[in-house]
Amino acid sequence: MVSTLLAIYYFDKKKYETSGIWLGISIATKFFPIVLLLPIAIIFYRSSQIRLMYRYLFTAAIFWGAINIPIALTHFDGWWRFFKLNLERGADFGSIWYALSLLDIKIPHLDLIYPLLSIVLFVGLAIYLLKLPTTPNLAAIALFALVIFTTAGKVYSPQYILWLTPLAVIALQNSKQLITFWFWQATEITYHLAIWQYLALFSDAQFGLPAGGYAIATLLRVLGVSIFTYRLMRDLSAPSTGIKD
């Protein structure tokens, strides 16, 4: 997460090569920062800096490859295992898909529905970013891409809050947004209490949270981050919130 924040910091300082290096390292360390390439590309496009965008992407790819290629060549099975797991896994803890299944709402062909939904949401985000009155800083919009990645995924791991919160903090524009921020954090606390009580049932404990309660806590968590994200996006759309033309 530190390397991701450094990539965002240097990008907004217009130190694109340094940012590209850190983003490449970030993607190599944990794959999720790859979703930042969408808002980055939109910012370059809106700023008419297409050549800089290609250079940025090349820099990030070089440093990603410098870390990944040697490992892939020497320990391919271990390197590929992460990608294989995410391709083959079904609906898992924390995801909206798992919550719906607990509520007896079955989603057929999840391996098709999940990527299609993700594509639709990312296309929607791209349209939103292109229609903003002014071009925002990366710090203001990085969270949006990560929220799509985490909430639409087949798993919503507990550690995702460690990824989302720093990006949420740097995206805050005014004190009024703190209301929805703390509401979201309250739903996260509720979820983290709920999942351990739900997992207790798997160990034949005499206490625990029923599946329906855990499903509601899961959906409440997604609702919390969605409301916060909506507030940020709404405020950013106001003409007076632009960063640059």
Segments from the language model and where they lie:
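Luminal/periplasmic active-site loops of membrane-embedded glycosylation enzymes
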Residues: R81-K106, A217-T218
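Multi-pass membrane glycosyltransferase architecture that uses lipid-linked
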Residues: M1-R81, L110-D245
